[in-house]
Amino acid sequence: MLYSHFTEDLLNLQGVIVKKIKKIENIIYIHIEMPVSEHICPICGEKTRYIHDYRCRTIKDLPAFNQQVVLIYRQRRYVCHKCGKRFSEENTFVPRYYQITRRLINEIFNKTESVSSFSLIAKELNLSVSTIIRIFDNISYTSPSVLPDVVAIDEFKGNVGDEKYQAIITDPKSGIVLDILTDRKQSHLIQYIKRYSKENRDNVKFFISDMWKPYYELSEAFFKNATYLVDKYHYVRQIIWAFERTRKRIQKKYGKQNRLLFKNSKRILTKRISKLKDEQRNRVENLLYIDDELRKAYYLKEAFYKILDCEDRQTAKKKMNEWVYAAQNSGICDYRTCSNTLINWQNGILNTFDYPYSNGFTEGCNNRVKVLKRNAYGYRNFKRFRNRILHMFSYQKNKNKNNEKEVA
């Protein structure tokens, strides 16, 4: 009765007979059997209960109470009285040819959805790193069979194989990672996009990217019916970069005290003034009093932030044209360069005032990928890296019927 209760409540192996439990050092050994039952011969289909022999299998299970658990499974082999075929009895807790339980395999799959390294997972489950990797490599993720109506693309620094950057394709509307590509080269992107039919590509309504020209050219060439949107973070960053270049150039004119004052105030100078506390606002006003050019650059930056509050494209276009004119006539070289960039990308920028999509979800995925890569000290195998990323977001992918998880 004690063993039965232990089985039901702790082992959760219903239908298994626990014969003996031993603890040696930090390992719990549980000796188990299956009850005798009628089996069907895999060759002729005849029913049999004849036992041929037994063999003991040592099977690793989930740790319990911070200790390793090992099942000693006395497995029967049945024999068919009609054709003589010998075969092992069926069980639900360990796959054929494996030395670990199904639930331990499932725990490996669950833990690899996190950003933990294979080494850390192996340590937590009392398994070797090679076992974790071998189990994980049974997972494969296919590319989506069709593209959704909203497609976003970005890159991250993966340094896998011979390529420095890998591309990530997402559906920000549904919050799904669609695919990871070996690189962001235009030739490879074109080759990938051509997998999808023209009809499917024509059904894509929105295409979102940063301000990298090959992405825009990809949108123009293959997603002719899609509205192109420049990610908000990237065009706002152009303004911040222009202001920062101006600040760094100006602070070099001054002595050590003021130079350090400008440098140490970087965060509050780039932050929107409406989000500053009173004490921070006073500090900013004192800094702007020191230099006229810095003051002009600061108010140009703030004027652009106000454009972001516009509720429609027409208002934003009017405000942006005014801002571009002011920037080009400001006498600040960094803002002239920045304003030219905004002119070149104006249509994609203004589209963001009509539609709610951005690359925010994609950037969030990139940040998580960076943590994964850092924890593992990098990846050399792209296929494994791709599967790990897609598996990490599999709770989202499972909502999409076009992406299937295949476990061998």
Please annotate each region the language model reported.
Residues 1-85, 91:
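Short, conserved DNA-binding cores of transcription-related domains
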Residues 34, 38, 43, 136, ...:
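Acidic/histidine-rich catalytic cores and adjacent linkers
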Residues 45, 58-162, 201-202, 349-350:
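Short, positively charged, Gly/Tyr-enriched micro-motifs
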Residues 48, 128, 139-140, 211, ...:
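The DNA-recognition helices of helix-turn-helix-type DNA-binding domains
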Residues 86, 186-187, 217-218:
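Short, well-ordered secondary-structure "scaffold" segments embedded in the functional core
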Residues 90-91, 170-176:
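Gly-rich Lys/Arg/Thr-decorated short loops/hinges at beta-loop-alpha junctions or inter-strand turns
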Residues 97, 178-200, 206:
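Active-site beta-loop-alpha junctions of metal-dependent nucleic acid enzymes
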Residues 167-168, 240-251:
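Short, surface-exposed amphipathic charged segments that create phosphate/polyanion-binding patches used
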